[in-house]
Swiss-Prot record:
This is Ferredoxin-2. Binds 1 [2Fe-2S] cluster. Keywords: 2Fe-2S, Chloroplast, Electron transport, Iron, Iron-sulfur, Metal-binding, Plastid, Transport. It comes from the Eukaryota. GO terms for cellular component: chloroplast stroma. It is found in: Plastid, Chloroplast. Belongs to the 2Fe2S plant-type ferredoxin family. Residues 3-93 form the 2Fe-2S ferredoxin-type domain. Ferredoxins are iron-sulfur proteins that transfer electrons in a wide variety of metabolic reactions. GO terms for biological process: electron transport chain.
């Protein structure tokens, strides 16, 4: 399945199509978006974002605590969409504050 992923960045929103077997960060890069990342393995906070609607599967991640995921935090480098989803990007500072 393919879902609509709305990425809300500091420079505006962009909607991309992302397959349920494709990491959101990878799909965004294919569309020419410049999103932050570092390890690409779900083990740091560089690519952190916040889900404001919809849901993702990020079971490959090893950095976020359960409580943070319940609050909507997401690591875009290892997150698959499980439906249409809206994510605020560039949130590392807020997560680690």
């Amino acid at each position: 399945a393919t879902y609509k992923v709305t990425l809300v960045t500091p420079s505006g929103s962009q909607v991309i199509e992302c397959g349920d077997d494709e990491y959101i960060l990878d799909a965004a890069e294919e569309k020419g978006m410049d999103l932050p990342y570092s390890c690409r393995a779900g083990a740091c906070s560089s690519c952190a974002g916040k889900v404001t609607s919809g849901s993702v599967d990020q079971s490959d991640q090893s950095f976020l605590e359960d409580g943070q995921m319940e609050e909507g935090w997401v690591l875009t480098c290892i997150a698959y969409p499980t439906g249409d989803v809206t994510i605020e990007t560039h949130k590392e500072e807020e997560l680690t504050a």
